[in-house]
Amino acid sequence: MDDLAWSIYEYLLDESTDFQGEHIVLLPIIVIARKFDRNHRTISRRLSALRDEGLIKTIIKKDYVALYHINDQEDND
């Protein structure tokens, strides 16, 4: 996992909403792509890396919008 993936994770955690003690976020990939000035394929690869590491979990995915559950690193320690 590289610095971009970690930055995306921190951004998703900052943008997330606390719902029943869990962090969730609903964002189109294009919003993340514009924030980091990258294309959607690059962002998709980083999101896949975050999923592989267990830092995020896709709850709902429809076209280019996804609802993610964000695992807080502090909760895992």
Regions found by a protein language model. Name each.
Residues 28, 61-77:
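Short, cationic-aromatic polyanion-contact patches
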Residues 33:
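The alpha-helix within a helix-turn-helix
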Residues 44-48:
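Short, hydrophobic-biased segments on the C-terminal half of alpha helices
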Residues 51-61:
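A short, conserved structural fragment
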